[in-house]
């Protein structure tokens, strides 16, 4: 039985993620935790996202109710709209969400709180119109949120100097900050304004949530708690990979991409323990042919087994000589995989990652050493966290043209797979894996914050 917390009434929460896989997953996992505490949970996603998911998902979030609203791009979703998407989503989504709330209320359904993606701050305005408490959910690291907040408040000036400081975190070099802060000339773009707009009305939110855990960013979290009612509720992975307290919770259950699952698992089963380098850069990264060539050569030169996720549309960039390596069984190329199952497999010894925060948390939670190869957004800061602060990986630097060269990448892979520093990194990875599990266990820091939120919800 999944753990159940006895409460006097069953409150109802709407969860509204931004319609990207990396944002939807944390919301779903948080929803499952809330349900285990006796809270009724409804996920509100876009019509396009829901339709896309039904095509690929083999599992369902049976315990979470699903509702859909329009983002104004019901056919093509956010990828079809470009920079106009954010404004379209705000205008159309606000009305569609209001209509949904009216519909639910007319059916006798109460809504006690709306927890929304920080990237859709306009949801809070809708919630306030209906007298409903709101909570902003940040899917990025606390330190990244702090950097954006300090810029928003004018406490950090742009363009940046050579170094940047925020409370509770070691000094960052300019190149270690989120990319949008480095390229300040792009600061007026809609996506940039959205990042700073996360804080426009946040003081009106009753709660602020973050997908992190206390030991991971202890001092930054303590500072953040001085300004907001912060609930630290991560890592938001399926329970099977952490505390195993939720029955049959093995998958996010809301997949936008079709995974080559059995092919991956069968291939990994034939490989020795910690012998495979897993290479994946998330759903949004698109490498040019030159970078794909450099990654290929690095993997071949490293003489390791490798599993590389590269989307069908990108396969044409793969060099012809790679097919010979694939035929030997030393490498496997797939369009998508169930990353958690791959990282949890004993044959995987290293993760070459773009350092999106979901992938960052997954690597930490499953104890897999990383080669950090950040691409954009917050990933440069996450890479610093993994390498310099946690000691669970090593950063590979790009050249002046933004290309990571084969020699640098191969050197980092060998460092983790073969050298003494790799042994130290692996020990650190095990330590942080254990700390992540403790956080979500009963009485752990994240579990306590969820219990506290439920208590506050009931008293509303």
From Swiss-Prot:
Pfam families: UDPGT. CDD domains: GT1_Gtf-like. The keyword Disulfide bond does not apply. It is an enzyme of class 2 (transferase). Its EC number is 2.4.1.-. Disulfide bonds: none annotated. GO terms for molecular function: quercetin 3-O-glucosyltransferase activity; quercetin 7-O-glucosyltransferase activity; rebaudioside B glucosyltransferase activity; steviol 13-O glucosyltransferase activity; steviolbioside glucosyltransferase activity (stevioside forming); steviolmonoside glucosyltransferase activity; UDP-glucosyltransferase activity. This is UDP-glycosyltransferase 74G1. The keyword rRNA-binding does not apply. Keywords: Glycosyltransferase, Transferase.
């Amino acid at each position: 039985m999944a753990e159940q917390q006895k409460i006097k009434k069953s409150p109802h929460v709407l969860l509204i993620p931004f319609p990207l896989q990396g944002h939807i997953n944390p919301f779903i996992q948080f929803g499952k935790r809330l349900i285990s505490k006796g809270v009724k949970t409804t996920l509100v996603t876009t019509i396009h996202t829901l339709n896309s998911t039904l095509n690929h998902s083999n599992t369902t979030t049976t315990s979470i109710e699903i509702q859909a609203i329009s983002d104004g791009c019901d056919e093509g979703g956010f990828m079809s709209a470009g920079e106009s998407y954010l404004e379209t989503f705000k205008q159309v989504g606000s009305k569609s969400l209001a209509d949904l709330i009216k519909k639910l209320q007319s059916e006798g359904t109460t809504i006690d709180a709306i927890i929304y993606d920080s990237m859709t701050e306009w949801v809070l305005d809708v919630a306030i119109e209906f007298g409903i408490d709101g909570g902003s959910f940040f899917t990025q690291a606390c330190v990244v949120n702090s950097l954006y907040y300090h810029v928003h408040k004018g406490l950090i000036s742009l363009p940046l100097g050579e170094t940047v400081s925020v409370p509770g975190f070691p000094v960052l070099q300019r190149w270690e900050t989120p990319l949008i802060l480095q390229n300040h000339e792009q600061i007026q773009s809609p996506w940039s304004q959205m990042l700073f707009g996360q804080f426009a009305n946040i003081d009106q939110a009753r709660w602020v949530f973050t997908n992190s855990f206390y030991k991971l960013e202890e001092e930054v979290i303590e500072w953040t708690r001085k300004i907001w009612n912060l609930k630290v509720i991560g890592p938001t992975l399926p329970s099977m990979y952490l505390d195993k307290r939720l029955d049959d919770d093995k998958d996010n259950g809301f997949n936008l991409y079709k995974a080559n699952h059995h092919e991956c698992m069968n291939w990994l089963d034939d490989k020795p323990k910690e012998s495979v380098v897993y290479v994946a850069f998330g759903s949004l990264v698109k490498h040019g042919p030159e970078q794909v060539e450099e990654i290929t050569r690095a993997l071949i030169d490293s003489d390791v087994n490798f599993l590389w996720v590269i989307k069908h549309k990108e396969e044409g960039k793969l060099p012809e000589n790679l097919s010979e390596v694939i035929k030997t069984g030393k490498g496997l190329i797939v369009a998508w995989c169930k990353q958690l199952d791959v990282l949890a497999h004993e044959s995987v010894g290293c993760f070459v990652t773009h350092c999106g925060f979901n992938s960052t948390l997954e690597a930490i939670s499953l104890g897999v050493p990383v080669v950090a190869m950040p691409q954009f957004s917050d990933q440069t800061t996450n890479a610093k966290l993994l390498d310099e602060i946690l000691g669970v990986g090593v950063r590979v630097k790009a050249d002046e043209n933004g290309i990571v060269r084969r020699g640098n990448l191969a050197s980092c892979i060998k460092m983790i797979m073969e050298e003494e520093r790799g042994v130290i990194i692996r020990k650190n990875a095990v330590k942080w894996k254990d700390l992540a599990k403790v956080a979500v266990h009963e009485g752990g820091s994240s579990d306590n914050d969820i219990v506290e939120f439920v208590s506050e919800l009931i008293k509303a």
